[in-house]
Amino acid sequence: MAEMEKEGRPPESKRSRKPAHPVKREINAEMKVPSNRPLPGAGQAGNLHGNSPYLMSFAENTMNELLGWYGYDKVELRDSDDIEIRNYPDGEMRQHISVLKENSLPKASTLENSSGSPPHANSSGSTPTSRNGVTAESSVNPSSSKEHGGLPIIVPLIPPPLIKAPAEEDSSNVQIMCAWCQKVGVKRYSLSMGSELKSFCSEKCFAACRRAYFKRNKLGYVRNCSAREEEGVPTHSLSKDTPRLVLKTNSDVLVCDWCKHIRHTKEYLDFGAGERRLQFCSAKCLNQYKMDIFYKETQAALPGGLCNPPLPTSDTKSESGAGVQLLTPESWSAPLSELRSRKAPSPVGATIAGPSGSTSGSPSEAGTVCSSSSSSSSSSSSTKIPTPRPHESPSLPPPHPPPISGLHPALGMPPGSPPMVMTPRGPVPFPIFMEHQMMQQMRPPFLRPPGPNSPHSNPMIPGIGPPPPPRTLCPPSSPMHRPLLSPHLHPSSTPTLSGNPPGIMPPHPAAHMPGLPFPPVNMMPSGPIPVPPIMNIGMPSLAPLVPPPTLLVPYPVIVPLPVPIPIPVPIPYNPQRSGDRPGNDGTLPNTANEQKDSKAPPSFSSRGEERDFQKAPPNSDTLSPEFSKQTEQGRTNMADLMVKMENSGKGSSEHSHKDTPADGVIDLTTSHRSRQQLVIQRAVTCVQVKAEPGLSPPPALLGETELDGSTSISTGTAKDDHRDTYSNAESPLASVALPCADPSYCSGTPPLSQPITCSASIIPSNITTAKTEPGSATPCNVIVNGSCNLPPTESLIRTPPLEQRPQVDTCRRTATVCDEPAGADLEGEDLKENSCLATEKDSAGKRCSNDQSAITTGTGDDKSQSPEDDPSGEDHAYALPLMPKPGCVIQPVPKPAEKTAAILPCGLTAPLTGTVPMEMEPPLKRRCLRIRNQNK
């Protein structure tokens, strides 16, 4: 090899490896040949697909050569030498020949020797060779001459000698065993390998074998060359002999009989003796082959019923099943005839009902079969039974799997005979099996509670009363039961034998009931009696039997247990509403009525208006954030009904601020929706009034209030009232609900009953409405929304009564706009008083006289502030922080006076009294105090 490579191989090998362009040229020339002369195979039958053999061989050769170039570099050396030896007297240019040629030449020689096909010419002018029915004579000569030119064109011209088209002599519909896949089929391809001609059923098998053959040839050629070189024989002289040598050496290189691969780096392992010797590339392949053989033999030996569960190899079952005993647990100690005779009925009929019926004659045998199948079947039939068992294991699965296989022996002990039981120790005699069955019978009493399921589990034992218990025991021992019961039942089975079976087993039955219920039922009647004898006899035998079940379980058995899984269901919950409800339990139902009555008024307050009003007054804006915060807090704490007054002393000054910014603090509605849409649906008994520091109305607000005129005075009064409310709320009534104690006040608020929107126009309109429609809303709930109160107050002051009228009208507030500021103020004061009284009643203990004095002090400030600020202040005094939106919306809803009062906090009255002159404040405060005292 080395010499050959040194001589001329490198350059020529390159040519042979890269003949792309030259090959194309040659191909073109060759393809043109038919036009000039008839194709070599023109007269012969069409190849493969009806194409001329010449063209077919050309294509096949080309493909083969390509495979050689890219897949087998060194194959070209050997092939080229062989081909050139035959084609050329001198071996100089032989190396140019492509791998395909090389393969074809050795194949040709083999064909000559083995198939008797016409010998392929060894010389360049060889007689036409019939390969695939193609004559390569003409092509060989020109190709050889061209090869000297360095173009290995011959490859396409030489049809692969290995392939014989089905159309050829061999192609007749001859049934052959494929040399590759070992399947019987029509002969489609043949390949000469060494001294034998191999036939293939398909192109796929042929290609795989050819590849392996190439590898062998390459390896053999290398070996031969190395041997010859060592001997000192010149390569040229060897060249002619090389093909034969190569073939011989190829015979040494074998394809692994299991994986069908050629592994040059590994030494093959020989297996078998005589004519048929198998070679395997590794111990793994050898072991797999042995396992396959063993499996096939076992299946063949097993009776039909037993063989069914095992595996697809059942094809071979019939072959060796009848009289051949294989190395199986059953064959060790039990005659196959017995197994077959017993199992023959059981697999079919006894599988379901047969187990009881077929084994009824020999319950002990049936039990042994079951036990053996349970113990040994876990290994063999575990694949089949375990699969169903995981699902069925709780109840019927164990018994059903045995029916599937026929009897338990069939499932778990394909090889074992009924008398022989497979255990961790090994096959157990039938008597031991009987003992094991006895143990199983002992189990049934324990399993009796599960018994109801026994009919299911007893599908195998349905007919046999006492025998069934053994089978029931068998199911437990069977892989299906073993997973569940083996840990408990087997340990308990031993105690059972000792005399504790009932004690131990009952717990297990409970635990095992899902899986074993069927055995207990049948076994309970017969099981309890046999248990003591079985316990004594079976103790030793059971010990071996019990462990196997645990060992035999190949698959984990999943026992479905119903476990309640809590599914969280989100329930919409509004803390504000809930807070209002607990505090307003008495008033809530009324509030609902009020809501119904005042559903129209809620539309009065438009948050947009309230917001606009808030924006207008700077002081109100400054205070509104605080108030909004308070309102938000109030929402969260509505249930608590906490009036958040940081300082009762601050209540007056802060309250005036809040009155401005926190006008909406008086949120009697639990939610924004109630504010907007409904008059206070829920009497906000929980009025959380939080006096925020700095509530004292800024001078600017006071100035605004003064500018507004009478409204500013009323606002001041309202603020004073609110301050009182805040102080009271802060002290005793911080957490007290503020329902209207006096219906009269609520009725007094009827002008307020019309909801006052936060918008300035709305609030004045509310005041006016109070005047015009004191009776329009009988009991009224005044809802003051958070910070909105300030803007409404401003609107009261700033907005002309005419503007207020349309707003009031839109809000369903019938009120003459504050055309008469004085009159409107007075009416507003009245409304304030009413609302204050109502709120005072609501907040009775919540607001102290000190708070009222503080409110009075703040009232002057509030007056100086814009009337909007004042209402907001008032809202703070009486307002619940519950409503987050700024602006005080007083939505009077006709309803019971108590409810209305509860809904109307003093803060509400404050916005109403925003128009009340300052003079009115002291009396209003007094009234509020009185109401509060009454509530207390």
Swiss-Prot record:
InterPro entries found in the cross-reference section: RAI2/SOBP
Zinc finger region(s), FCS-type: 169-207, 247-287
Identification of the protein by name: Sine oculis-binding protein homolog A
One GO term of the biological process aspect: animal organ development
GO CC annotations on file: nucleus
Entry function: Implicated in development of the cochlea.
Protein keywords: Metal-binding, Repeat, Zinc, Zinc-finger
Basic and acidic residues bias: start-end ranges: 1-14
Biased composition (Pro residues): 395-404
GO function term, MF aspect, one: zinc ion binding
Extent of Low complexity compositional bias: 349-382
Lineage: Eukaryota, Metazoa, Chordata, Craniata, Vertebrata
Region (Disordered): 1-46, 108-151, 311-330, 336-424, 486-511, 574-632, 697-727, 842-877
Family according to the record: Belongs to the SOBP family.
Biased composition (Polar residues): 108-144, 617-632, 708-717, 850-859
Superkingdom classification of source: Eukaryota
